[in-house]
Curated annotation (Swiss-Prot):
Gene: GOLGA6L4
Organism for this UniProt entry: Homo sapiens
The protein's name in its UniProt record: Golgin subfamily A member 6-like protein 4
Residue pairs linked by disulfide bridges in the UniProt entry: none
Database matches in InterPro entries: GOLGA6L, GOLGA_cons_dom
Biased composition (Pro residues): 1-11
Regions of compositional bias (Polar residues) in chain numbering: 51-62
TM region positions: none
Positions of region (Disordered): 1-77, 491-552
Presence of keyword Ribonucleoprotein: no
Family under the similarity heading: Belongs to the GOLGA6 family.
Keywords: Coiled coil
Length: 574
């Protein structure tokens, strides 16, 4: 019998230890992420919606404040950090589960190695015992081969003593051969179990390797995603800086426009004042024109008077008052000249005023055109900025959707890995249950084999008691032959260590004698090894001899019963 294997600890205890390890790993992960990103809250949820700036935060000019864009960007960072926390926690759980499974596998391999070592040591011990017995048999064979001198039959002869010793040794050899055969069968069963366990361990190692490769791939993907997120954060920071610069420029432009509007208002006020002055001047000019008309009327009247005077002078050609009239005429002409000069000056002033008005109108038109051009340029700038903002928002939305898709794919992969890990743990539990059932079945088979051996020994003793006595010489020859055959079979048993697995049901059936058939000489069959006396006559237990030989066979059967009982005790102790 092989020693009892050391089984792994109870599954409930292993589950408790795994849960403790998982809780410790989660705490360490939370502390690590809090150290790495202190601005992120601990209770952030992965499924929170990432909303942008609200429409209520718009300014009077249609521009958003720089704080609105910053809130949306930092919201993205928080959501990505929460998803990374979930992925890292799931990865740590998988790593802890892999560590626990590797520990269980190492314990099982240690148990298997210890079983193999103990079986090898027992096999070596049995081979050593068989070699000792073979040497003693060889010595006895040499002693029996020497010619014996006839002695008086004072007591039991040397031949009978040697015969008894050979019988006893033969029985011991048979028992040792059976023990060796049982050990070989047990070793075969153990080798089969070891092979199955090695195959399962190889499969588990392959699964673990595949899972490790998948975990490595996931780690690479996580690192790539972290790099992408960092690049995106850098891009978003650059975009924020650009937006801030744009907003600063727009603020400066708005201030300039406000200053220009104030200047335009001042200019408009000045223009209003100038228009009022021009209206006053027009009124004055109208008054002057009326005065000039009155003067012209007066001049016309004076001309008529002068004509009348000339006519009178013509009538009074030689009047003494001609000189006086000429002087008056000269005075009137002088007055007319002065009036004409005044009229010319007034006309010049009026023309100058009209020219100034035209120039002022041209200036006003130019200023209005400039203002319109500025307004048009500002509208175009606003349109371009609005287009840039829309494009940036679309790019951000597309990037968010892509990141969410990647995170969902990673979560699906992690769930698949967790499902595989759960199935693997179930397989391990089933495998442990199967190993326990197989060990219990092997113990039952071992008990049945012990009972079969005891029955075989009983049948052999009965058959030897019923056998007919023969001459002692033939018995010695048969015993010598049987010892030689036993040595050969022991050598064959040493060489053949990898025989086929025995069948317990067939052995139980073969251990019983056939009902209704005559039992020939040594016709009982050993169900444990599956051989007959015709195939192996050395181990057939021939009981041909005198009554003393039959008695020796009975004593050998009693010894075998005692050895079986001692073996049972050894099994129970182990």
């Amino acid at each position: 019998m092989w020693p009892q294997p050391r089984f792994p600890p109870h599954p409930a205890m292993s589950e408790k230890t795994q849960q403790g390890k998982l809780a410790a790993a989660k705490k360490k992960l939370k502390a690590y992420w809090q150290r790495k990103s202190p601005g992120i809250p601990a209770g952030a949820n992965r499924k929170k919606k990432i909303n942008g700036s609200s429409p209520d935060t718009a300014t009077s000019g249609g521009y958003h404040s720089p704080g609105d864009s910053a809130t949306g960007i930092y919201g993205e960072g928080r959501a990505s950090s929460t998803t990374l926390e979930d992925l890292e926690s799931q990865y740590q759980e998988l790593a802890v589960a892999l560590d626990s499974s590797s520990a269980i596998i190492s314990q099982l391999t240690e148990n298997i190695n210890s079983l193999v070592r103990t079986s090898k040591e027992e096999k070596k011990h049995e081979i050593h015992l068989v070699q000792k017995l073979g040497r003693s048999l060889f010595k006895l064979k040499n002693q029996t081969a020497e010619p014996l001198a006839p002695e008086p039959p004072a007591g039991p002869s040397k031949v009978e003593q040697l015969q008894d010793e050979t019988n006893h040794l033969r029985k011991e050899l048979e028992s040792v051969g059976r023990q060796l055969q049982a050990e070989v069968e047990n070793n075969q069963m153990l080798s089969l179990l070891n092979r199955r366990q090695e195959e399962r361990l190889r499969e588990q190692e392959e699964r673990l390797r595949e899972q490790e490769e998948r975990l490595r791939e996931q780690e690479d993907r996580l690192h790539e995603q972290e790099e992408r997120l960092r690049e995106q954060e850098e891009r978003l920071c650059e975009q924020e800086e650009r937006l801030r610069e744009h907003e600063e420029r727009l603020c400066e432009q708005e201030e300039r426009l406000c200053e220009q509007e104030e200047r335009l208002r001042e200019q408009e006020e000045r223009l209003h004042e100038q228009e009022e002055r021009l209206r006053e001047q027009e009124e004055r000019l109208c008054e002057q024109e009326e005065r000039l008309r009155e003067q012209e009327e007066r001049l016309c009247e004076q001309e008529e008077r002068l004509r009348e005077q000339e006519e009178r002078l013509c009538e009074q050609e030689k009047l003494p008052g001609q000189e006086r009239l000429l002087e008056e005429v000269e005075k009137l002409l002088e007055q007319e000249r002065r009036q004409e000069e005044q009229e010319r000056l007034l006309e010049r002033e009026r023309l100058l005023e009209e020219v100034e008005k035209l120039l002022e109108q041209e200036r006003q038109q130019e200023e209005q055109e400039r203002l319109l051009e500025r307004e048009r340029l500002l509208e175009e700038v606003e349109k371009l900025l609005e287009q840039e903002r829309r494009q940036e928002e679309q790019e951000r939305l597309l990037e968010r959707e892509r990141l969410l898709d990647e995170v969902e794919e990673l979560l699906d992969e992690v769930e698949e890995l967790l499902e595989q890990e759960r199935l693997r743990q179930q397989d391990e539990r089933l495998w442990q249950q199967e190993t326990l059932q197989e060990l219990e079945r092997l113990r039952e088979l071992e008990r049945l084999r012990e009972l079969e051996r005891m029955l075989e020994l009983g049948w052999e003793a009965l058959y030897e008691q019923r056998a007919e006595p023969r001459s002692g010489f033939e018995e010695l020859n048969n015993e010598n032959k049987s010892t030689l055959q036993l040595e050969q079979q022991v050598k064959e048993l040493k060489k053949s260590g990898g025989a086929e697995e025995p069948r317990g049901s067939e052995s139980a059936a073969a251990a019983r004698p056939v009902a209704g058939a005559p039992v020939p000489q040594g016709a009982w069959m050993c169900g444990q090894a599956g051989w007959t006396p015709q195939e192996h006559p050395g181990l057939s237990g021939e009981a041909v001899g005198t009554g003393e030989a039959a008695g020796g066979a009975g004593e050998a059967a009693c010894h075998s019963f005692r050895a079986a009982e001692n073996r049972e005790l050894n099994i129970t102790i182990i």
